Amino acid sequence: MSDWVNKLFVERSDLFLKLMDQRWPRTEELVNGMMKVLRDNGVYSGSLLDLCCGNGRISIFMAKKGFKATGVDISKAFLEDARRKAEEHDVSSTVTFLEGDVRNLKEVVGSPSQLFDVVSNIWTSIGFSSYEDDLKAFKQARELSKKSAILFIAETMHTEYLSIKFTPTSYSEFDNIVMLENRKYDPITSQANTSWIFYSKHGKNLEFTDKVEIQHHIYSLSELTSLLRKAGWETVATYGNLATLQPMSPLTSLNIVARAR
């Protein structure tokens, strides 16, 4: 596990949980879009394997659509919050959350009672370590899935976007936190280096909380579809917004729909 991954998702999970919670209000629309794609591909029900599930928003909303969901994440704190939210949404009986590294996916999941119908990887949850590690994770996901399974990679950053709309500095506010982002991007290596600096708000004053240095490989569409093909997945569609099924462009996020080969 990369040092920054451990710090952001394990040691300072309290900060990233607040950031993840900001995405919950848009999750139902995202899952509605996923369901339309699934129906168009002949999948109406079944089981979901949610990779890097965070605090469970995709697993929980898919469970509300009737799917049996299994979420995997390395962060104990994220999974504890996910289990609480599953109870709040009354789907705890059909959602399972497992702690572990997706690079060791088969070991974490074990031998499921049945292979999965759907696999999801949402919100730029790839490129954290190496190409080989991402390939390994998606290969294992394929081995755990049915021949007709559908894979979603959604809300993901890509090189085409950064080549046109790279922003070196920005900030965001959530709860009582202000987060400053300083970014550097190398188009030759597709490596993004970002400083996330967190401040807590005290009236009109800001107090430094922590800093995380993130090193992250950004995929192009062609690079990622090639990786998926090697892992046993064939890309069948791309979108700029999976909730609205807007076509992908260099100015949208990357959303891939792939079918098991």
Where are these regions (language model features)?
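Conserved class I S-adenosyl-L-methionine
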Residues: 1-52
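Class I SAM-dependent methyltransferase SAM/SAH-binding core
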Residues: 60-105
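SAM-dependent methyltransferase
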Residues: 152-225
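C-terminal lobe and adjacent flexible extensions of AdoMet/dcAdoMet transferase-like proteins
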Residues: 221-261
